[in-house]
């Protein structure tokens, strides 16, 4: 699982802005060091490790979830460009399509060190083993040595070997928005965005039935299915909507299981994670024709819910996915 606003201010306004940012950051528990150049330095946790960030000017974002977090906070002018592998749906389908149009498309390949250096990036937003990795020369340590700051999705810190940090998936989303708000000095905006998300989530949870529907998330795979453990957003989407992830007992993120375990759990609903390069229709066709799965209750009753890829990875769109899936479950019960 698989930006720069150069504003001319008077000296007085710059000083006032720095003081305001300092006060806001202090209230969020971050340490800030004002700079006379209009650039702010702030210490924020990165997977449990205190890291000093300087206000980024040329951010590169990897996949839709990273871009959407920046756009949701109104930080488009700080984004130089985006890297979007083939699994991601077209950016024209995003709620932030207009923001994508304002920044550069850099590549449809995996994130790599050469791309970041060529883009003259000073900041990258990605997940551990989803953009950031030792293998591709994009670990935080390597990027630090190149003068490129890195921000890891809190949800992905579960797998980060150096400074692991655990967050429930939706809590990780809120944490990311709050931390990005600190780094870019838009804490109040982040607080407003997070508060609205929490309000929407609680509205869904208030309507969730007490009887939980067993749900299987099908990511990919035919010999062995790839699915969601309890450390990724679909687990919270299923739970908050009134379902029960049949693999919620797996303390992991995206993981392989055996078809025998799926058959034994007898899911009544199957969520299909819809990749651009692995369409949902193709996966549904496999489930309906495979001897291993064609007799599952969800398959027999044609109970498939298609979850957009960017609603399934850590992203502000997780809440959209939750609302849609909750409505689907309510319709099944009506």
Stretches with model-predicted labels:
Residues 88-89, 130-138, 148-179, 212-233, ...:
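Extracytoplasmic ligand-binding site segments that recognize negatively charged/polar headgroups
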Residues 112-123, 141, 146, 257-266:
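Short helices/loops that flank or line small-molecule/ion binding pockets
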Residues 167-176, 249-250, 269-334:
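Structured C-terminal subdomain patch of bacterial secreted/periplasmic proteins
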Residues 65-68, 85-88, 123, 129-133, ...:
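Solvent-exposed loop/turn segments at secondary-structure junctions
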Residues 2-21, 26-68, 179-217, 329-334:
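Bacterial Sec-exported substrate-binding components of ABC uptake systems
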Residues 90, 227-254:
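Alpha-helical, coiled-coil/dimerization segments enriched in small aliphatic residues
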Residues 44-47, 103-114, 134, 250-259:
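Short helix-initiation/N-cap motifs at beta->coil->alpha
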Residues 62-63, 67-119, 123, 128-132, ...:
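A short, structured surface patch at a secondary-structure boundary
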């Amino acid at each position: 699982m698989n930006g720069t606003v150069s504003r001319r201010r008077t000296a007085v306004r710059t000083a006032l802005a720095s003081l305001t940012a300092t006060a806001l950051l202090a209230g969020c528990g971050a340490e800030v060091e004002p700079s006379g150049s209009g650039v702010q330095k702030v210490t924020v946790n990165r997977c449990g490790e205190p890291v000093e960030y300087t206000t980024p000017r040329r951010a590169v974002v990897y996949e839709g979830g990273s871009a959407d977090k920046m756009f949701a906070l109104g930080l488009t002018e700080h984004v130089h460009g985006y890297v979007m592998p083939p699994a991601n749906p077209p950016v024209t389908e995003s709620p932030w399509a207009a923001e994508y149009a304002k920044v550069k498309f850099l590549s449809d390949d995996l994130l790599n060190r050469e791309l970041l250096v060529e883009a003259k990036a000073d900041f990258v937003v990605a997940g551990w083993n989803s953009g950031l990795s030792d293998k591709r020369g994009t670990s935080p340590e390597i990027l630090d040595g190149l003068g490129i700051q890195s921000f890891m999705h809190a949800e992905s810190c579960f797998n980060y070997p150096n400074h692991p940090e655990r967050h429930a998936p939706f809590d990780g989303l809120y944490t990311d928005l709050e931390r990005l708000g600190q780094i870019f000095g838009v804490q109040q905006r982040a607080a407003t965005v997070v508060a609205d998300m929490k309000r929407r989530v609680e509205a869904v949870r208030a309507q969730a039935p007490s009887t939980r529907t067993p749900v299987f998330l099908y990511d990919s795979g035919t010999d062995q299915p790839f699915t969601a453990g309890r450390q990724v957003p679909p687990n919270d989407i299923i739970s908050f909507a009134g379902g029960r992830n049949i693999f919620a007992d797996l303390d992991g993120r995206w993981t392989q299981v055996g078809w025998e375990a799926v058959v034994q759990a007898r899911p009544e609903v199957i969520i299909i994670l819809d990749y651009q390069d692995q369409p949902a229709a193709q996966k549904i066709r496999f489930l309906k024709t495979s001897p291993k799965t064609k007799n599952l209750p969800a398959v027999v009753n044609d109970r498939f819910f298609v979850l957009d890829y960017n609603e399934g990875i850590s992203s502000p769109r997780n809440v959209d996915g939750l609302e849609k899936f909750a409505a689907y479950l309510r319709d099944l019960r009506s």
